């Protein structure tokens, strides 16, 4: 397998740091290598004989900025490390940055700009499934390649997307299995009103019913909704044993703070969340979220040598108060996996890179553990970790799968999912 050692790269990067700082346009900061939030490209972003240009496409403004900034920062960290270690195929990476502004239509427009006008070699971007689905036809029409870093609802596969976050069998399904094994039977489903939560809840409903459980309520909130009083009243009336939370962005802040105002804690209404990571805990407050559960593949507390190096590098670059998270780590992995695929291909050409990926041997010794791109569906083999939020603001693993889990985005290996006939929501 083609593997990259994070410890070796970190050591080499440290020894070359002074050299790297002298290189023009190496992608070391947003101001000198990418673009400003309004999309104005700096001079250093121009491609040349010694550089290769990539795109970063995330929400720097709007309701999703709370989550996507950390993902963008992790990508920049990976770019800086790779540049300090010699670059990719002898070229330094420069990045062009665009703001999706938490609007799917804006993501589509900015994706086309990166591909058609900026002529980037690849794009790292998106968070919500709505933004991913908005850009998917753009990448397919231009035969460009998107690296998508966030867990999602599955039911999708594209030759022009590499999915470095979890498929549903690597986050949602094992989390529900964990709760069922713990004796939870009455589930309340709460989500933002878009593709991921609605499809995720179709999956969860089928799984819970097949196991003899009950969904006692299902509610959705607009992405910019701030008043959760009516939804909280419905939760009180339903009296669930567990809330399954697929809210995204600032909705999580409003919901949990309003629950806290009613003195509801994890003791009264325990919650399993699929889009709350360390960054959101820092924003909402550990005093509010302690005791609640989450399901991911990585936490800042994950005990691997590669993660220790990653956390130290992230905090050194962005500040000791900053925290890492699963989506940030998956975004960081994506840059290294792209590097490995280009080096196997011997080219930045999209078709050559896709051909290299199809061999199923592109791996990275990531902070979460070794991840490998499945050559057929372009999702990653990943470990699964259930975590609990503690009062120090960190998330600690309470369960993990004994081995990494192969991706099954369409849940074809689960009889209850096949029988339910779950279909993607467009």
Go through the PLM ranges and name each one.
Residues 2, 27-426:
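Extracytosolic ligand-binding ectodomains
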Residues 21-25:
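C-terminal motif of bacterial Sec signal peptides marking the signal peptidase cleavage site
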Residues 2-13:
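Bacterial N-terminal signal peptides that target proteins for export
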Residues 14-19:
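Hydrophobic helical h-region of N-terminal Sec-dependent signal peptides
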């Amino acid at each position: 397998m083609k593997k990259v050692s994070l410890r070796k790269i970190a050591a080499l990067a440290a020894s070359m740091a002074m050299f790297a700082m002298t290189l023009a346009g190496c992608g070391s900061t947003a101001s000198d290598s990418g673009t400003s939030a309004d999309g104005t490209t700096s001079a250093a972003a121009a491609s040349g004989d010694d550089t290769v240009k990539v795109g970063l496409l995330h929400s720097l403004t709007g309701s999703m900025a709370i989550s996507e900034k950390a993902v963008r920062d992790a990508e920049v960290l990976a770019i800086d490390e790779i540049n300090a270690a010699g670059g990719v195929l002898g070229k330094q990476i420069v990045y062009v940055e665009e703001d999706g502004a938490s609007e799917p239509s804006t993501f589509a427009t900015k994706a086309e700009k990166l591909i058609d006008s900026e002529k980037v070699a690849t794009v790292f971007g998106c968070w919500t499934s709505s933004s991913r689905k908005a850009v998917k036809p753009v990448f397919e029409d231009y035969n460009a390649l998107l690296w998508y870093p966030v867990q999602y609802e599955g039911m999708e596969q594209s030759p022009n997307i590499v999915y470095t976050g979890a498929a549903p069998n690597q986050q949602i399904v094992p989390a529900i299995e964990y709760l069922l094994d713990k004796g939870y039977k009455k589930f309340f489903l709460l989500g933002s009103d878009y593709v991921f939560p609605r499809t995720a809840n179709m999956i969860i409903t089928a799984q819970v019913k097949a196991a003899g459980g009950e969904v006692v309520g299902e509610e959705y909130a607009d992405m910019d909704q701030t008043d959760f009083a009516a939804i909280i009243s419905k939760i009180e009336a339903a009296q669930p044993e567990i809330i399954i939370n697929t809210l995204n962005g600032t909705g999580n802040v409003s919901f949990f703070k309003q629950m806290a105002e009613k003195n509801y804690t994890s003791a009264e209404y325990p919650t399993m969340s699929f889009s709350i990571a360390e960054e959101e805990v820092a924003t909402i407050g550990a005093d509010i979220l302690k005791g609640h559960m989450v399901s991911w593949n990585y936490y800042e507390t994950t005990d691997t040598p590669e993660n220790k190096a990653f956390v130290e590098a992230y905090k050194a670059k962005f500040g000791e108060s900053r925290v890492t998270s699963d989506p940030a780590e998956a975004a960081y992995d994506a840059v290294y996996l792209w590097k490995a695929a280009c080096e196997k291909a011997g080219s930045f050409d999209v078709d050559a890179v896709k051909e290299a990926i199809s061999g199923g041997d592109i791996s990275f010794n990531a902070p979460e553990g070794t991840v490998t791109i499945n050559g057929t569906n372009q999702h990653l083999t990943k470990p699964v970790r259930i975590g609990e939020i503690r009062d120090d603001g960190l998330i600690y693993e309470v369960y993990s799968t004994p081995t990494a889990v192969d991706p099954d985005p369409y849940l074809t290996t689960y009889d209850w999912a096949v029988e339910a006939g779950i279909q993607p929501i467009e």
